[in-house]
């Protein structure tokens, strides 16, 4: 990671940290020194989030709170003892992240519009589970198209399998870029 960051690459470390405060603080401090640009931390409680902020110190590392994984549906949340639907849980966790001093959150595009309205324009919304129009959702229960995510206010899109598992990855990526450019009016 140090080598890639040293070459000027922006590293998005999707570690999804969740542990006791001391461990999260120390891990975040080590990652901040590595030159990573982004780090994900589960936004389940304020103690964990505040520990990550302390660990970051004055580093340029952007902290992103993971609200609810995009593959989790109502049954999955209920299995964890969570009775609130994602549409209610995501804004609650995003608010915890913002209050703790995080730079943004990782959230489905289905909640992005409500988050943008609630948390403001400067708060980052990173949207995974992106599926181009007509693509299979795979294990993503709350997937959206690139266009829908952008129109809802997403700052960044995370696109994986629609490119990496495509017969023609370059062609798939180019189509997604076209869809993004169209949504941006470029």
Question: PLM ranges: what are they?
Answer:
Residues 1, 24, 137-139:
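Short, glycine/acidic-enriched capping/hinge loops at junctions between secondary-structure elements
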Residues 1-20, 157:
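Active-site cofactor/substrate anionic-group-binding motifs, chiefly glycine-
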Residues 5-6, 113-120, 144, 178-181, ...:
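N-terminal amphipathic alpha-helix/helix-capping segment at the start of soluble metabolic enzymes
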Residues 16, 39, 97, 115, ...:
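Conserved, mostly hydrophobic/aromatic
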Residues 19, 23-104, 108-113, 118-122, ...:
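Conserved anion-binding
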Residues 34-46, 131-132, 140-172:
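Glycine-rich phosphate-binding active-site loops on the catalytic face of alpha/beta enzymes
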Residues 49-55, 150, 163-186:
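C-terminal helical cap(s) of enzyme catalytic domains, especially alpha/beta-barrels
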């Amino acid at each position: 990671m140090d080598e890639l960051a040293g070459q000027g690459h922006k590293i998005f470390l999707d570690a999804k940290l969740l542990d006791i405060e001391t461990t999260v603080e120390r891990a975040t401090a080590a990652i901040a020194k590595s030159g990573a640009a982004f780090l994900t931390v589960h936004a389940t409680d304020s103690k964990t989030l505040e520990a990550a902020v302390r660990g970051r110190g004055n580093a340029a590392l952007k902290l992103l709170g993971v609200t609810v994984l995009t593959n989790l549906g109502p049954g999955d949340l209920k299995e964890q003892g969570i009775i609130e639907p994602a549409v209610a849980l995501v804004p609650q966790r995003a608010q915890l992240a913002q209050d703790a001093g995080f730079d943004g959150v990782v959230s489905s595009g289905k909640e992005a519009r409500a988050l943008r309205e609630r948390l403001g324009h400067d708060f980052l919304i990173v949207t995974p589970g992106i599926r181009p129009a007509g693509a299979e959702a795979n294990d993503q229960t709350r997937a959206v198209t690139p266009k829908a995510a952008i129109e809802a206010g997403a700052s960044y899109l995370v696109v994986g399998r629609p490119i990496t598992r495509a017969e023609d990855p370059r062609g798939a990526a180019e189509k997604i870029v076209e869809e993004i450019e169209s949504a941006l009016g470029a």
